[in-house]
């Protein structure tokens, strides 16, 4: 039981931690103290539902559909490419502008819409929750499967609320930091986590020989949320 829960928690964190569109949005809401708890809560709820679906049968259904798998994989490639280009353009045009100079405050409806957008329109979320966490957890017996799903969900709760509250605590420092240096710092911080998650996926492929994992690693070895 302990080994299963440890695997569920660490694998859950490994899937979530690398900074991508979803995490970056949670971070930005925390920095600006703009409905950050609402953003974190909505991200957690989406993860809880998707992890549950994946662990209790959704992963097997998706793995049996080559077309669906291909759409998710290439959708993830395109989404990651778009997000990377958008971030680079934003950093280039900012040219040292301070975060405090553009508060980017949003209303509740806008925050809800953006959070759902960067979550449910992000193919990496489905790859992480439905495919990878789901396929790993579905191999356990029923009682262990429930424990795995629970601690994977707990990892999501811990991460998103830590990210939101951490951004609030660090917001005075981050607000004084220039955009270029802030983004470089974020990149340096998340690079080890990115590699950690790639190793987890390679381990899943080697140990459990899931037919879809080698395909994902070959096409795009570092998905970011």
Swiss-Prot record:
The chain crosses the membrane at residues 1-21, 37-57, 65-85, 116-136, 150-170. It is a multi-pass membrane protein. Keywords: Amino-acid transport, Cell membrane, Membrane, Transmembrane, Transmembrane helix, Transport. GO terms for molecular function: amino acid transmembrane transporter activity. Pfam families: LysE. It is found in: Cell membrane. This is Putative amino-acid transporter YggA. It comes from Aeromonas hydrophila.
